[in-house]
From Swiss-Prot:
Temperature dependence: The half-life at 45 degrees Celsius between pH 5 and 8 is 5 to 9 minutes.
Pathway the protein contributes to: Purine metabolism; xanthosine degradation; Purine metabolism; purine nucleoside salvage
Gene behind the chain: xapA
Broadest EC class assigned to this enzyme: transferase
Name of the featured protein: Purine nucleoside phosphorylase 2
Top-level lineage group: Bacteria
Presence of the UniProt keyword Acyltransferase in the record: no
Family: Belongs to the PNP/MTAP phosphorylase family.
Activity regulation note: Rapidly inactivated by p-chloromercuriphenylsulfonic acid (p-CMB). Dithiothreitol incubation restores the activity.
Biological function: The purine nucleoside phosphorylases catalyze the phosphorolytic breakdown of the N-glycosidic bond in the beta-(deoxy)ribonucleoside molecules, with the formation of the corresponding free purine bases and pentose-1-phosphate. This protein can degrade all purine nucleosides including xanthosine, inosine and guanosine, but cannot cleave adenosine, deoxyadenosine or hypoxanthine arabinoside. Has a preference for the neutral over the monoanionic form of xanthosine.
GO molecular function: guanosine phosphorylase activity; identical protein binding; inosine nucleosidase activity; purine-nucleoside phosphorylase activity
InterPro entries in the record: Nucleoside_phosphorylase_d, Nucleoside_phosphorylase_sf, Purine_phosphorylase, Purine_phosphorylase-2_CS, Xanthosine_phosphorylase
Effect of pH on activity: Optimum pH is 6.5-7.5 with guanosine as substrate. At pH higher than 7.5, there is a marked reduction in reaction rate and a steep drop at pH higher than 9. Below pH 6.5, there is a dramatic decrease in activity reaching virtually zero at pH 6.0. With xanthosine as substrate, the pH optimum is 5.8-7.2. In the reverse reaction with guanine or xanthine as substrates, the pH optimum is 6.5-8.0. The pH dependence of inosine cleavage does not vary between pH 6 and 8. Maximal activity with inosine as substrate is observed at pH 6.6.
Length: 277
């Protein structure tokens, strides 16, 4: 019987990253979604590595996702930052982000800070709002952990209770209050994409308790919790979901609307980092 071969990509990535940035241990890993890459421009002593040089990292096919890993210091905190992510709809399945997340764990990260652009299911939460995620509903097909378990990273069965860490979320609320803008909390609904949701699907998501909807987040959050990385996640609302507004949905509109919340988003993240520094 042949021996099962698990992915060694995270181990290879560690060796490659260490050649670019030796003796560097990041505390926080960021995933920056559509139109949100500007934060990485503020990283000091930055070193950038193309995903193409990192085995298992998702070479994105989506406009607005740069496809590079940036390492350095932000507000005095050592960080690693993904400018762009992979999505289920790009054809690599639910594990498209798993090697990257496990690389962060091996690098020494304690926390995954996940961002994304999302649609609002709540009429009072419009474009330009920020929503701190407190839980999720997964409508994608399965999870990244389907298949044989890689015991090097986590147990076969694991809990998603407090997957979106409550203490870190409270810290985000404190920062938002100090910065002077509202930070709503909500439940994220994952959607496979790449088509946008139908109005009927949106009504269903509202009924089952969803507040925001998007095409990412859940695969990386599940991968992170499997290897015991804490998670905090914030969605930038770029549109009202289908059926809740007359605006025609498009990716170009998503990128343009992400600009509405960009400065608040940067202030939120920088304030958060100052508090944990």
């Amino acid at each position: 019987m042949s021996q099962v071969q698990f992915s060694h990509n995270p181990l290879f990535c560690i060796d490659i990253i260490k050649t670019y940035k030796p003796d560097f241990t990041p505390r926080v890993a960021f995933i920056l979604g559509s139109g949100l890459g500007a934060l990485a421009d503020q990283i000091e002593n930055a070193v950038a590595i193309s995903y193409e040089k990192l085995p298992g990292f998702p070479v994105s096919t989506v406009h607005g996702h740069a496809g590079e890993l940036v390492l350095g210091h932000l507000q005095g905190v050592p960080v690693v930052c993904m400018k762009g992510r992979g999505h289920f709809y790009e054809g690599r399945g639910m594990t498209i982000m798993t090697d990257a997340i496990r690389t962060f764990k091996l690098l020494g990260c304690e926390l995954l800070f996940c961002t994304n652009a999302a649609g609002s299911l709540r009429p009072e939460v419009g474009a330009g709002s920020l929503v701190a995620l407190k839980d999720h509903i997964n409508t994608m097909p399965g999870t990244p952990m389907v298949g044989l378990n890689d015991d090097r990273f986590g147990e076969r069965f694991f809990s998603l209770a407090n997957a979106y860490d409550a203490e870190y979320r409270a810290l985000l609320q404190k920062v938002a209050k100090e910065e002077g803008f509202p930070l709503t909390e909500g439940v994220f609904v994952s959607y496979p994409g790449p088509n946008f949701e139908t109005a009927a699907e949106i009504r269903m998501m509202q009924i089952i308790g969803g507040d925001v909807v998007g095409m990412s987040v859940v695969p990386e959050v599940i991968s992170a919790r499997h290897c015991d990385l804490k998670v905090v996640a914030v969605s930038a609302i770029t549109n009202m979901a289908e059926g809740l507004s007359d605006v025609k949905l498009s990716h170009a509109q998503t990128l343009a609307a992400a600009e509405l919340s960009k400065q608040n988003f940067i202030n939120l993240i920088c304030g958060f980092l100052r508090k944990i520094a």
